[in-house]
């Protein structure tokens, strides 16, 4: 029994054969063993003052701006932040959740994008404070700061219509039930064009499949989505006169593809994005 305990706790001052160690680990996995969370006495005090920030990645200034603001405000109240970039990988998110439940005594979690494990996170919110920042989701049972995707999309549509555009293309990262903001922006664009009397084909949509998306560099996921899809559209030919990126990073990719193919903005095409990150003013 003591040998099992030492192997499971990864003691370094003892020696066991690889076969013995593997048998213990396999048995623990089969039985669903989980390392017990440290007691309050065992946990160093500073950990209880840490706020975990779950974000998809830090290459998009939208998220880094939020992280900076949250961290600055947390410091005002004596808290520190721990940023967990998941690259939108569910297994990475699960790792952080398990780490928090089993090893870290955190003060709370702030989600900057939709979790892939909503039932589990809903349950965790009964034990610690959790806040979500994003589109409204009635299935969330914890605190949420709602960020509308529909309203800015309507503003974009109204602006493009006022400039004389009658057909546009919306370019997005993969559309999914979890990432609702992507489809909400498209739906709002279509609805606004229809309200002005334009047909069903007024707004076309192009997005990468999850498989294509996963092949891209994690540091350039959104930018590369905009860049690759715009080049495909232009090579195929299009009657759209404007491109709308799901966010500013996608829009940057659209711009670079247009410039590379010698198109001028706004003379040949108009380009819009969302989020209003600082780089968008350059």
Identify the meaning behind each predicted range:
Residues 10-13, 57-60, 87, 174-180:
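Short histidine/acidic/glycine/proline-rich micro-motifs that form metal-
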Residues 29-62, 77:
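N-terminal helix-turn-helix/winged-helix DNA-binding helices
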């Amino acid at each position: 029994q003591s040998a099992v305990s030492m192997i499971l706790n990864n003691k370094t001052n003892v020696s066991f054969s690889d076969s013995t160690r593997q048998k213990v680990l396999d048995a623990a996995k089969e039985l669903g063993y989980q390392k017990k969370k440290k007691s309050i006495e065992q946990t160093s005090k500073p950990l209880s003052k840490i706020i975990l920030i779950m974000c998809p990645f830090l290459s998009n200034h939208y998220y880094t701006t939020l992280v900076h603001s949250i961290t600055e405000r947390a410091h005002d109240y004596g808290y520190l932040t721990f940023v967990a970039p998941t690259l939108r990988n569910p297994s990475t998110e699960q790792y952080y959740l398990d780490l928090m439940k089993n090893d870290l005594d955190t003060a709370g979690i702030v989600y900057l994008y939709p979790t892939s494990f909503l039932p589990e996170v809903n349950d965790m919110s009964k034990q610690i404070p959790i806040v979500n920042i994003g589109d409204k989701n009635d299935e969330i049972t914890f605190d949420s700061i709602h960020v509308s995707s529909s309203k800015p999309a309507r503003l974009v549509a109204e602006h493009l219509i006022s400039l004389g555009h009658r057909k546009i293309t919306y370019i997005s990262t993969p559309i999914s039930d979890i990432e609702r903001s992507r489809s909400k922006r498209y739906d709002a664009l279509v609805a606004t064009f229809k309200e002005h009397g334009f047909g069903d084909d007024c707004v076309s949509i192009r997005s990468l499949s999850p498989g294509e998306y996963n092949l891209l560099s994690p540091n350039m996921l959104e930018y590369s989505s905009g860049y690759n899809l715009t080049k495909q559209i232009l090579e195929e030919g299009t009657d759209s006169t404007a491109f709308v990126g799901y966010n500013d990073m996608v829009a940057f990719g659209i711009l670079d593809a247009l410039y590379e193919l010698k198109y001028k903005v706004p003379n040949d095409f108009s380009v819009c994005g969302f989020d209003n990150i600082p780089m968008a003013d350059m």
